[in-house]
UniProtKB/Swiss-Prot annotation:
It is found in: Cell membrane. InterPro entries: UPF0295. The lineage of its organism: Bacteria, Bacillati, Bacillota, Bacilli, Bacillales. This is UPF0295 protein GK0479. It comes from Geobacillus kaustophilus (strain HTA426). Keywords: Cell membrane, Membrane, Transmembrane, Transmembrane helix. GO terms for cellular component: plasma membrane. It is a multi-pass membrane protein. The keyword Transmembrane helix applies.
Length: 117
């Protein structure tokens, strides 16, 4: 069974989207406690915290995306953004690297870890 990889930007965007859904579900669960205003308010506040956290993550990935290196994918020919030493094309999932040492090697996300000096 092979590992399913995704580009880093898409992973972070998916995480932010999941925070939105979690926040809405938590707030919806709060409606079941309408008889207890304190518990309902706590659920609504926790749900709102998830939504605010999602907004912060979206803002962060937006600023990170503006600084990402844009490259043309050799496989599909579309412009994609790279974060780190290795990443995948957002469109066709072709492994990409800007590091000459890693060209031709099997794709592994561990290449993005900080090197020990």
């Amino acid at each position: 069974m092979s590992i399913k990889y995704s580009s880093k930007i898409n992973k972070i965007r998916t995480f932010a989207l999941s925070l939105i859904f979690i926040g809405v579900i938590v707030m919806y669960l709060g409606l079941f406690f309408r008889t207890s205003p304190v518990i309902m308010t706590l659920f609504m506040l926790f749900g709102m915290l998830f939504l605010v956290a999602s907004g912060i993550v979206y803002f962060w990935i937006g600023t990170l995306s503006t600084r990402a290196v844009q490259v043309v994918c050799p496989s599909c020919g579309k412009v994609t953004k790279m974060l780190g030493r290795v990443d995948l094309c957002m469109f066709c999932r072709e492994p990409l690297t800007l590091d000459r040492e890693l060209e031709g090697k099997e794709f592994d996300e561990k290449y993005n870890k900080k090197r020990k000096s």
